[in-house]
From Swiss-Prot:
GO terms for biological process: carbohydrate metabolic process; DNA repair; glycolate biosynthetic process. This is Phosphoglycolate phosphatase. It comes from the Bacteria. Keywords: Carbohydrate metabolism, Hydrolase, Magnesium, Metal-binding. The keyword Hydrolase applies. Pathway: Organic acid metabolism; glycolate biosynthesis; glycolate from 2-phosphoglycolate: step 1/1. The lineage of its organism: Bacteria, Pseudomonadati, Pseudomonadota, Betaproteobacteria, Neisseriales. It catalyses: 2-phosphoglycolate + H2O = glycolate + phosphate. It comes from Chromobacterium violaceum (strain ATCC 12472 / DSM 30191 / JCM 1249 / CCUG 213 / NBRC 12614 / NCIMB 9131 / NCTC 9757 / MK). Mg(2+) binds at D12, D14, D175. Belongs to the HAD-like hydrolase superfamily. CbbY/CbbZ/Gph/YieH family. It is an enzyme of class 3 (hydrolase). Its cofactor is Mg(2+). PANTHER family: PHOSPHOGLYCOLATE PHOSPHATASE.
Amino acid sequence: MNLKHIKAVAFDLDGTLVDSIPDLANAANAMREHLGLPPLDPERIKSHVGDGIASLVHRAITDERHAEADGPLWERGYRFFVQRYREHLADHTTVYPGVRDGLGLLRALQLPLVMITNKSERLAVPLAEQLGLRDHFSLIVGGDTLPEKKPSALPLLHCCQVLGIQPQELAMVGDSANDVAAARAAGCAAIAVGYGYADASTLGADLTVNSIAELYDLMKNG
């Protein structure tokens, strides 16, 4: 895929820039204990990640991808989860190898970088700050920043508008079906990372890279 026309790059957060499963799983299991439920294996919680904290709380309570918890139970769980997770955002969350260097290389190409995540903005921004990633991004759009989140095209189109570029000039880099679907809906290039939470071969992206440095090489060489 030729990337010469790309003028900006958007990145997902969880599973793309950072591995946050340890802290998400700890918060989810602390919430389950608070609600009188037994703990879940972190791999189960990993399978529930990707649609924001509200959905994760439903799934962590029910242990079902498409089920919703009873309203009052969800509210208790949500309040507990957010407080617990906010207090332990980066205890065990790690930046994937090569991410910092890769972001620096892309910025050296004078490409604006934005973050588009389904994690709420009030959690995504401090997490990026604590991990030393915030300064790489000119804009961070969380799952609650706009009326719609991925897989909606809205977050991507919003970034295009802010940056003054056309949708086809934005590349969306992520690890999930939501990232690819949002890119498709917006008319942006869809790039998957091969190391994320999902099997990249199942996502139907335009391109799969195994590091951000690999993406830099492709963009530098057109």
